[in-house]
Amino acid sequence: KIIFLFFFIASFFKVSAKDLATWGITGSKCSQALAFVQRFGSNGKMALSSGIQGFLTGYNSAVMLNNLQGKSREKARVINRSSLDSITNYVTSQCRRTPSVSVYVVLLKYYKTLPYAKY
């Protein structure tokens, strides 16, 4: 079921039309992500949650790696402070307010509010 969902999501978003900074549902405009969730209901919300989790984990890992290698002073954050469901609801709420922004912009703003991790 998860593999099918992955391929379904991948085919939903055009990837050859332009260069992308981030890929998948978190790389889309908020309006597209909201339409996707509305169209596919709980499966759409699960896909959005998975994209959010992947984005935050990947971004945080890059921040941590750059910090540990001395390339940046920015430190990683505690990304599981709230439940994934709460984060998804936050992103959905912010996307409703500003449907023209990209989901990753909402996520980067959210990320900056998180406490620093200790490592």
Where in the sequence are the language-model features?
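Sec-dependent N-terminal signal peptides
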Residues: 2-11
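Short N-proximal segments of mature Sec-exported proteins
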Residues: 20-93
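Surface-exposed, polar helix/loop patches in the mature regions of secreted/periplasmic/lumenal proteins
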Residues: 74-119
